[in-house]
């Protein structure tokens, strides 16, 4: 797959290179977290060819023996090289049981510069301070922006490129497929995996039908004012027996996993946030087209 230099993210990593922080790279599935680590590794090796980089990718079966924190901790220490700069890269760290114990232990030894990636539902911004004893530095990675899309395809005409970007979106893994139907199949699979693995697994969702209805509602009402109560009222009219607190929790879970972003209303005159009716946006707009179709495209 073709790679582009995602400089805005790479620069953030370079700026904290060598600091004692635990660097945490989060973002929606398939947004490029692993590729960013690859690019950062190449940068480090170009600057310090003699460094020692210990890299673990839990997406690969090669590391299935390291799925407990003790095994992970011992493995990293076994590959430590005295007298060199030692870096630890761990991809999809949440797949290791009690991973925070291993990371905290490695950090406490003060021997490693640590970088980890993970699914956002398992590495919440609000949880980082409680998971890790050391200071963390979070970098949030997003799907391709419009400018990155243009760079990837070498496009010059912004107007023509915008039409294509609206249809194809920023999930770069879909670019490998030849036709739009296949692209949307890929994007729908990414979203379904996000819902099933990241959200249902993390939060032990039992009412999966309700979760699906909330997802459909938010997708169909992107940029409209929404609240847990008005969604509850809408679904209640379909004879669903639900409570607005449950709906609100499910909406928060969707945001935790970067499926949606919540934008709060702001009172400019009063200079304060309003407490109700926020707007919700998808992390990539093509999730909507892949799941609901393109008949009502509104651009």
What function would you assign to each model-found segment?
Residues 3-20:
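Pre-Walker A adenine-sensing motif
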Residues 100-116, 120-121, 129-130:
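Conserved catalytic/switch belt of AAA+ P-loop NTPases
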Residues 180-299:
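Accessory nucleic acid-recognition modules appended to NTPase machines
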Residues 119-121, 126-225, 229, 259:
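Interdomain motor-coupling "hinge/lid" segment immediately C-terminal to the ATP-binding subdomain
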Residues 25-27:
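Hydrophobic anchor at the beta1->P-loop junction of P-loop NTPases
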Residues 54-86:
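Short glycine-rich substrate-engagement loop in P-loop NTPases that contacts/grips substrate
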Residues 34:
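Walker A/P-loop
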């Amino acid at each position: 797959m073709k790679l582009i230099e995602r400089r805005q993210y790479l620069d953030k990593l370079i700026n904290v290179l060598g600091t004692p922080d635990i660097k945490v790279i989060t973002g929606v599935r398939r947004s490029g977290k692993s590729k960013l680590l690859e690019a950062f590794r190449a940068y480090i090796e170009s600057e310090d060819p003699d460094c020692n980089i210990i890299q673990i990718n839990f997406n690969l079966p090669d590391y299935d023996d390291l799925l407990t924190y003790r095994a992970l901790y011992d493995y990293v220490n076994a590959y430590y090289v005295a007298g060199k700069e030692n870096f630890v890269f761990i991809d999809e760290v949440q797949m290791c049981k009690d991973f925070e114990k291993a990371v905290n232990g490695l950090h406490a030894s003060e021997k490693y510069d640590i970088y980890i990636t993970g699914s956002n539902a398992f590495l919440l911004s609000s949880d980082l301070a409680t998971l890790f004893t050391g200071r963390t530095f979070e970098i949030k990675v997003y799907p391709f922006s419009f400018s990155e899309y243009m760079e990837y395809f070498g496009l010059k005409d912004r107007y023509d490129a915008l039409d294509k970007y609206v249809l194809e979106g920023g999930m770069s893994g879909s670019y490998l497929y030849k036709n739009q139907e296949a692209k949307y199949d890929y994007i729908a699979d990414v979203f379904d995996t996000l819902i099933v693995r990241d959200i249902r697994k993390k939060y032990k969702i039992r009412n999966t039908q309700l979760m699906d209805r909330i997802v459909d509602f938010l997708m169909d009402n992107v940029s409209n004012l929404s609240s847990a109560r008005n969604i509850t009222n809408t679904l209640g009219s379909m004879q669903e027996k639900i409570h607005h607190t449950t709906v609100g929790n499910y909406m928060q879970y969707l945001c935790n996993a970067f499926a949606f972003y919540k934008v709060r209303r702001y009172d400019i005159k009063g200079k304060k946030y309003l407490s109700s009716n926020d707007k919700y946006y998808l992390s990539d707009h093509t999730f909507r087209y892949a799941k609901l179709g393109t008949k009502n495209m509104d651009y």
